[in-house]
Amino acid sequence: MKGIIFYKNSYEKAFEKLEEIINNYKELNYSITQYKKSRLDTVITFSNGDYWQIKKANEHSRGFACNIAYIEREIEKAIVDTIIMPTIKAKTYTGFNFW
């Protein structure tokens, strides 16, 4: 599964959300196999193959694909509808949540 956390202005809030996700995986006994943290590209991969990244939601966020997305509530509806929602691809499980 691939997940993306989309944020508007606060990278720190998006990283807090990623830390929540990391804790959930730790409770399921999945270890981290790759961890890359930078302001422009934060990526984490777990031992079960799941992949999470943090992306800023703007006009340049096109071209990504994921099965699940966490979307910051402050992001404009037009960006959500035209840019973020098309990135969510159907698999056996698909979803999005606002945080």
Protein language model regions, located:
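Phosphate/NTP-binding elements of NTP-utilizing enzymes
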Residues: 1-99
